Amino acid sequence: MRSSLLWIWFTVFLILQGCVNATVQPNKISKAHTTELKQRYYQVKIKASDGTLIAFTVYQPKLSTNQTAPLILHTHGFGLSRMKRPELSLYGFLLPTGQVAKSAWKKGYWVISFDQRGHGGSQGKIRLTDPEKEAQDVITILNWAEQNLPQLAKNQNGVRVGMIGESYAGGVQYIASALDKRLQAIVPITTWYDIVESLAPNGVPKSNWIDFLNLIGDWWNWNKFDPELKQAYRDTQQQQLNPYIYDFLKTHQASWFCQREQPPQADALIIQGFRDVLFPFNEGVKATKCLQEANRQVHLIGVEGGHLQPFAQHSPLGSTPFWYIGKSIRCGNQKSYDLQKTIIGWFDLKLKDQNSSSELPEVCIDQSPVIQINDLKPITSYDLNKTWIAPNTTQDVFIPIHTANQKSFITGSSLLSLAVETENDDATFFISMAVKSAQTGKYKTLNEQTTPFNPKRKQLYDQIISRLNLKTQNYQDVELPSINTHLQQGDTIGLLVHSQSKYYKRVKQNKVEAWISGQIKLPKLWSEKEVTQQ
């Protein structure tokens, strides 16, 4: 009920936001002229390189004569629209990236909040962060800012620019940064590194989320999907990934650029969530590694939330219903950080050369001892002896892996190497990391995550990605979503196998039967003593 009421409020505010349409054009100021600037905001529309009108709001800071200020670009999540006003807008009064952008403006930053094509006041069709469309729009806005905004701070790369946004607004940051070095500091929040793997893990489409994205992308924003995106959506209804979908989306992700030695050129503060069933924490880990290999300065923050499956997961009281990140975190260095203040402080460091008041570790995960990216690696192998499983709609199967002999902490993703023998060559297994409580004997799925594994579709998926006609393998590798939890003495961590999933409603099967065997690698198990000694 609470989620429904919040959704209604979202709708009301989005309608109100769209009802105010006054547009104020900036005063043309020569590059040599400096003056005292008053704090204000105004609306602008410009043409992209292909003639598409792009709408944005310029937030002008209060600046004294000869004072300069960096620029922060802000944009919105999928199906939403920009911070058109500092109060009467969804981002202006509620969503955290808007709050950060508004705080930056009041602290003396130029801020541009823009509608991505196919959203809000911008024209065009949605192509899901196409490097030649959505990412080029970012570059077009940067060009406009350099030519029209007075007293912009600059360095050897041009205007000193940062960018922030969540989800859909995060994916475009990686790509735009790979294309334009003027973006010097990015804050991608709960977004993808590999959109193909995120939307169709192991070749099985996330039908519930994909249907929801179609609803808000092509129905809420009426008929705004590009024809190619419409076709890709229709193809997912067949419950498998085909070459057409991959060919359309392959360049719309950071992984494409990283694998071709054209990584993002900005330093990054990446925020990713463990309950996020659309873009799991793994996506942030992979992006962090890419940027580190490119010698960029990067911090990874792990929060509890992220994207929640509508009506299947629930956010904490007071949070938005389908997405949240929380307000503060406590890292492995035993320090607490306010998220919004941390982001502003990081922008101050990168764009204003101001020293940060608090040292953020390389990796900061809420309630976890991990402080370095290498701490997340799977390192300990366990054999999975050949076992007969037959999960059905009323009974899941638990496969024990390790029983804790003391209180322990575990954070990171696990790697499965799995062999499956089954008569049904199209059976899908839903695999979760889970803990069996020593006290109650009950199972708990960790971070509400699950991974689909269909041996036949997994092989097709690997062939599409690699462009090779791969031979059938006895063992197939499966990366499980990252977990962040602790075990009490006597608790057992293991795999929980289901025949159905609330995240994949289009997969209909009452029962699956198979012999399974293989190996699993778990991340480090931290003892309580190791944690207290950090």
Residue positions per predicted region:
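Glycine/threonine-rich phosphate-binding loop and adjacent beta-strand/alpha-helix elements that clamp
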Residues: 20, 24-30, 40-45, 352-534
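N-terminal cap/lid segment of alpha/beta-hydrolase-fold proteins
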Residues: 29-67
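Short substrate-entry loop that stabilizes the transition state in hydrolases
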Residues: 65-69, 77-107, 112, 117-121, ...
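Alpha/beta-hydrolase active-site loop
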Residues: 129-150
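Short beta-strand/loop motif that positions the catalytic acidic residue
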Residues: 264, 270-272, 276
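Catalytic histidine neighborhood in serine/cysteine hydrolases
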Residues: 291-316
